[in-house]
């Protein structure tokens, strides 16, 4: 079986840029009319000229989403385990070179955080950590999952890339989904954003979803950090990656997230500004291209945008998020990974969803379905 690296190496960044610029309105219209969409159709949907068809794309995305997922929005909350990190990433508040107080939750603190989330009726929790293998490695994660398993129906993780064996252990412990972001697929500049630490290894990170799929994880989540490089080109490669994974690890489900670069301690300014209309175009493009793909919108986005996107392709949202370890109860002043934009409570988010004519879903999965 070809690895994604084999496929990735067949493409050049500048060639994809040129192809995007050459797309015509007729190309977009033909792609919209096709029954079975390909990665080439996705490229047409995210092209600059496709913005002229945004209204048509939005209506199509709305119809396809309701047909596949109904009028529901799944809700989750992140639980940050640690802000310790061995990497230097020029855009992240947890970066090793930021001289800030580091914190890793103890078992007692972890359960205090969990209790607050349970009081908000949260049943899907996303465990997040900086990348520090000695402090927060596989044994720490396994312990956290075991402690939380009886309290939450759905546990996802977003941590450093691990080995296939380690992902198998997490799956057996009760992890339902793993999220991993390449940040950017622009290999030539990747090192500039990640000058030190294991994250500087572009290929190892690129091959992580293969290891997740081989381990039998139920759901794999991908995304890029929008704002580092040209969002259209990065998104093409991200979709290419999802396309490859679905063909080779077809038993797994897939989701895509859209983190836009947000203010953080020691942050850099975005190299490429992504306007709301651009993000809307991208979300619609993903939905029209792939009807089964889960689309997740975090509290990085503002209230107005999140209210609007509910009916146009989103299937999953975070709510009441704290992006620092202990942020819900233990240590509310510890360093955040990034600033949130939508600071509404869980109840406020649920009420907003209901007013939009949709149903907020707090539980959509249980580990019993995996035989765990």
Question: PLM ranges: what are they?
Answer:
Residues 79-81, 131-133, 159-163, 184-186, ...:
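Active-site-proximal loop/turn and secondary-structure-junction residues that shape catalytic pockets
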Residues 53-74:
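Short, charged low-complexity linear segments at domain edges
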Residues 77, 114, 141-145, 167, ...:
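Generic structural signal for well-ordered alpha-helices
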Residues 69-109:
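Canonical Radical SAM [4Fe-4S] cluster-binding loop centered on the CxxxCxxC motif
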Residues 164-172, 229-243, 302-312:
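Catalytic cores of alpha/beta
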Residues 96-112, 117-212, 218-222, 226, ...:
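Core AdoMet radical
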Residues 61, 89, 180, 212, ...:
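Conserved, mostly hydrophobic/aromatic
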Residues 1-50, 118, 247-372:
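Auxiliary Fe-S-binding modules of radical SAM enzymes
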